[in-house]
Amino acid sequence: PRSTLFPYTTLFRSYGKLCAAWFGHPERKMRFIGVTGTNGKTTITNLIKHILTENGRKVGLIGTIQNEIGDEIVHTDNTTPFVYDLMALYAKMAEAGCDDVVMEVSSFGLVQQRIGETHFAAAVFTNLTQDHLDYHGTMENYYQAKKLLFSRCDTAVIDTDDDYGKRLYSEVTCPKIAYG
């Protein structure tokens, strides 16, 4: 008998779409800001959350230390939760009236398509240093993993003090802002 094999990427993309539909597409109900890089994600996501909150926005936070829905703290196991858990979290945030979600987006989350169909109003790149090479194998693979975030954003904010940031700045096609 003949069997059909689904490529890994197709399977996870389809699963992400299914999870989003199951939860009523919460990723379409809020504005998202994603932060990626080896270091600084937690600091930057918390600063952005504070700025938005001080300007009257209700903000959800997804990160390494904890997830937050307004003032409620929600336990986390991964920097970027797996897609089913992420969509469930988005749904709770939307139900709680969150306007925005600020999230750390890990290289693992990007490669494993944990963020589903999430589109980001802004994506921030902090830096890239040697880390997770046991998973990615090479710095080039690690860079390409981080770069995936910038194919799904309206505006890129990139630290150009970093050599990989300079490269990313030259390669992204969306409107971009340099800092550093």
Question: Which residues does each predicted region cover?
Answer:
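Phosphate-binding loop of NTP-binding sites
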Residues: 15-160, 164-175
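Short, small-residue-biased leader/transition segments that mark boundaries at the very start
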Residues: 1-11
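Residues at the C-termini of beta-strands that transition into short coil/loop
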Residues: 9, 63, 179-180
